[in-house]
Swiss-Prot record:
Gene name of this polypeptide: rplR
Pfam families (UniProt xref): Ribosomal_L18p (PF00861)
Gene Ontology biological process terms in this record: translation
InterPro entries recorded: Ribosomal_uL18_bac-type, Ribosomal_uL18_bac/euk
Annotated PANTHER family: 39S RIBOSOMAL PROTEIN L18, MITOCHONDRIAL, LARGE RIBOSOMAL SUBUNIT PROTEIN UL18M
Gene3D superfamilies the record matches: 3.30.420.100
NCBIfam families for the chain: L18_bact (TIGR00060)
Signal sequence interval, chain numbering: none
Entry keyword DNA repair: no
Keyword Kinase set for record: no
Key words of the record: Ribonucleoprotein, Ribosomal protein, RNA-binding, rRNA-binding
Name listed for the protein in its UniProt record: Large ribosomal subunit protein uL18
Source organism: Francisella philomiragia subsp. philomiragia (strain ATCC 25017 / CCUG 19701 / FSC 153 / O#319-036)
Complexes and interactors: Part of the 50S ribosomal subunit; part of the 5S rRNA/L5/L18/L25 subcomplex. Contacts the 5S and 23S rRNAs.
Cited function: This is one of the proteins that bind and probably mediate the attachment of the 5S RNA into the large ribosomal subunit, where it forms part of the central protuberance.
Amino acid sequence: MDKKTARLSRSKRTRIKLKELGHTRLCVYRTPRHVYAQVISGDGSTVLAAASTVEKDVKAKCKYTGNVNSAAIVGEVIANRCKEKGISQVAFDRSGYKYHGRVKALAEAAREHGLQF
């Protein structure tokens, strides 16, 4: 089993558990160039809020979109958008990635700006 397949199987396990519990989840996806975050409803049918480094307002705040600083900015933006929609508590779905680097920066920034995991 290669790295990508192992990550995908870890993410499937997490998503199944979160779907059973019915919690709203903050889902993270990363590429070498960008970081994406979505808040998805408990049943998995609706995206309630989203933010990424592809967006112009986020891209303007950072020099390079694939690093820890830009991930922290995405975490801040997603937390603010959740506040506007009245969402304060989410389950953190790291999509099988290690809790390190960009994923950790996004999570900590979201926590600092009012999201509870």
